[in-house]
């Protein structure tokens, strides 16, 4: 902390308003902004790439002045959005700088976990579409096993924050949870499959419902989908039957049965 002097005396600060501040140790005037959002600061000597994670240090000050400080691994995420100037990233909290072990951390009142997304929202001029859509979805949809798993969520929660990377301001990001077994409260494999999770990994025949390629349970990918859970066993039969129904069912059968097949 360094002493500083405002160029013009102020009695009340306003978020988003620029203030000129003189810092003697630099013998310079800087522009200072106040924000009502949490502030993230990530520093790393390494180039951040799309895998593997590189070591970095994470520090966040929440609006209640709580501070989270930890070593992390960080990498770029996304597909075509990696070509944009402002990158989305994912971070993994580490117990130390080696990354040999991860640790669960609670951020911004969201879940406690070691994996988090930092959404850049570069293609959203108002930075509201992704967050609002996810909020609306969670308010509208309840999964069919909600009664037995009241904490299960078929979606993610996101919170706004302002991000600095190596002391350079990157703009507003959304800190977000991940859709995974933990979020959905899927049961662990215990000799049989009790819940499945797939990811649409690419635009292919099955993900676009344009074709029905054959599948192999020896592969974790099929028709543009990636099999995410469980790790112990792969069975594409349920998803194959669903895609088959969408593509090949006669209209009258589709309209009679789709409501039972899609929760």
Task: Cite the ranges covered by each PLM segment.
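Serine/threonine-rich, repeat-prone extracellular segments and beta-strand-based repeat modules
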Residues: 2-19
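Extracellular recognition modules
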Residues: 20-24
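Residue-level detection of beta-strand-connecting loop/turn positions
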Residues: 25-27, 62-64, 167
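Edge beta-strands of extracellular beta-sandwich domains
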Residues: 26-34
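Hydrophobic alpha-helical membrane-insertion signals
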Residues: 33-78
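Internal "kinase-insert"/substrate-recognition segments embedded within catalytic cores
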Residues: 95-100, 104-106, 110-123, 127, ...
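A conserved helix-loop-beta module that forms one wall/lid of the active-site cleft
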Residues: 121, 125-164
